[in-house]
Amino acid sequence: MGSADERRFEVLRAIVADFVATQEPIGSKSLVERHNLGVSSATVRNDMAVLEAEGYITQPHTSSGRVPTEKGYREFVDQLEDVKPLSSAERRAIQSFLESGVDLDDVLRRAVRLLAQLTRQVAVVQYPTLSTSTVRHLEVIALTPARLLMVVITDSGRVDQRIVELGDVIDDHQLAQLREILGQALEGKKLSAASVAVADLASQLGGAGGLGDAVGRAATVLLESLVEHTEERLLLGGTANLTRNAADFGGSLRSILEALEEQVVVLRLLAAQQEAGKVTVRIGHETASEQMVGTSMVSTAYGTAHTVYGGMGVVGPTRMDYPGTIASVAAVALYIGDVLGAR
């Protein structure tokens, strides 16, 4: 990037920063007054003319100032060198708040609420997906000699409990055998593979009488549980923040709210997040959704060093504090992964 290009990018960066802060179109005089650009107002005007001709900024009809375009925001984000770091106190507060969650649901609810507060945007967190979750442990408990409680725990912290009604009573020795058979079939397997293994058990041993009948009944109930988890789930928080920024969306606020409620677009964008620690910024039309025009989405994946559990991020207007939002999304994702991975 040549010196003139570098100077124009500094002008663009100043326009983005001021417009995000003030929501008012930016003129050359205010840029010279607020920023140490080292050039005259006339030079800044010339640079703004070039930026406008190249599509990075535009002039609203009602103002003599300029505002960034989607292309301008994209250039600004692509040229970001330093993402605003969170303070050590902020990081400790995030970690402590998430660690206080009692289970997977509570941790994710806390995460979505926290992210909405940090960014003042709509926060979205995808529940751990079926394809990536692994069965960590299966426990089988006899409530009565003919009634069992099965508890499935995944590596992401998901806990599912099911009751199994047996046709015949089983003794403690048979209960231990049942626990071993089911544990060997499930533990350490991805949920998708576990459902296949359980289906095989049900077909091989179901109806064989005695222990075989108990295995078949338990496997059938487990299969129902595993199949139910195929549905993608999304947590939303801070939707009221959209109305606070209603002016940024023109007349499209209703369609944005509908897209968030339907979840399909957001889940599609989050599904593309395959690498924990890498933050993706989609601006305006980059979301590839007419319903989401006028919005930006900052997202990443969360999980452990070896497993991605799901995606998370924020949705807000293109007039967004990108450095601060990127830092917040990255930090919350990191601590969600740490908290869930330690359980």
Swiss-Prot record:
Domain of life (superkingdom): Bacteria
GO biological process, one term: negative regulation of DNA-templated transcription
Keyword Transcription regulation included in the entry's annotation: yes
Keyword Cytoplasm set for record: no
InterPro entries linked to this entry: GAF-like_dom_sf, HrcA, HrcA_C, WH-like_DNA-bd_sf, WH_DNA-bd_sf, WHTH_transcript_rep_HrcA_IDD
Annotated Gene3D superfamilies: 3.30.450.40, Heat-inducible transcription repressor hrca homolog, domain 3, Winged helix-like DNA-binding domain superfamily/Winged helix DNA-binding domain
Record-level Gene Ontology MF annotations: DNA binding
Swiss-Prot/TrEMBL keywords: Repressor, Stress response, Transcription, Transcription regulation
Record-annotated disulphide pairs: none
Family of the protein in this entry: Belongs to the HrcA family.
Role, per record: Negative regulator of class I heat shock genes (grpE-dnaK-dnaJ and groELS operons). Prevents heat-shock induction of these operons.
UniProt name for this protein: Heat-inducible transcription repressor HrcA
Native source organism of the sequence: Mycobacterium bovis (strain BCG / Pasteur 1173P2)
Taxonomic lineage: Bacteria, Bacillati, Actinomycetota, Actinomycetes, Mycobacteriales
Gene, per the UniProt record: hrcA
